[in-house]
UniProtKB/Swiss-Prot annotation:
Domain of life of the source: Bacteria
SUPFAM superfamilies (UniProt xref): Ribosomal protein L25-like (SSF50715)
RNA-binding listed as a keyword: yes
Swiss-Prot/TrEMBL keywords: Ribonucleoprotein, Ribosomal protein, RNA-binding, rRNA-binding
Presence of keyword rRNA-binding: yes
Subunit record text: Part of the 50S ribosomal subunit; part of the 5S rRNA/L5/L18/L25 subcomplex. Contacts the 5S rRNA. Binds to the 5S rRNA independently of L5 and L18.
Organism: Aliarcobacter butzleri (strain RM4018)
Function as written in the Swiss-Prot or TrEMBL entry: This is one of the proteins that binds to the 5S RNA in the ribosome where it forms part of the central protuberance.
Stated family: Belongs to the bacterial ribosomal protein bL25 family. CTC subfamily.
The name this protein goes by in its record: Large ribosomal subunit protein bL25
InterPro entries in UniProt: Rbsml_bL25/Gln-tRNA_synth_N, Ribosomal_bL25/Gln-tRNA_synth, Ribosomal_bL25_b-dom, Ribosomal_bL25_C, Ribosomal_bL25_long, Ribosomal_L25_dom, Ribosomal_uL5_bac-type
Amino acid sequence: MLEGIIRDSMTKQATKTLRREGYLIANIYGKGLENVAAAFKKNEFIKFLRNKETLAFDVKLGGNVLKVVVKEYQKCPLTSELLHVDLMVAQAGVRTSYSIPVKAVGTAKGLKNKGLLMVHTRRIPVKSTIENLPNEIVLDVTNLDTGDNILIRDIQFPANVDCYLDPRVPVVGVIKAK
C-alpha cells in the first residue's frame, strides 16, 4: 500500500518546497467526493506503479484507505521528470471511463518477411465498473502477416465493458519495412 500526506497549503511556494524534498504532487478526486490535495514520495510512487499488478491500487492518506486509478500525469518537457499526477477514486458499482493498456503477445508471421510490428493504440478507452475491468488487453499477433491489422471490432471485450472508439481503429498491425 502506498502512503502519502495531505497537503495543507496550496501555494506555489509550498509546492516548490515539497518537490525539492522529493515529493510528487497529486490530486485525488471521485464522483460525489471532495477533491483531496496530496503528496507522495516520488521514488516510492514510481517503484510502486512499476510493480503493481492491477489498474486500481490502494493509497493511505491520513488514516483513510482509498482505491485509486491513475487518470493523468504531467512530466517536465525538458527532463521528463514526473511533476504531477491525477488519481481517480475507483468506486464499486459506478461506471466510469478508464484506459486499459494493450499487450501484444507472440511473434507475427510478417516479421519474417521483413515487416515491422506497429502498436497503433497503446491504451484503449473503455467505460466499465472497476469490478469488470480487465488489467490489460492481450492480443495474439502470431497470425498477422504484412499488411494485416487487428482492429477494435476484432477484440472481444469482457461483459459490461464498452469501448467507445470507432470499430475501424487499428490497434496492432504489421507494416512493410522500407
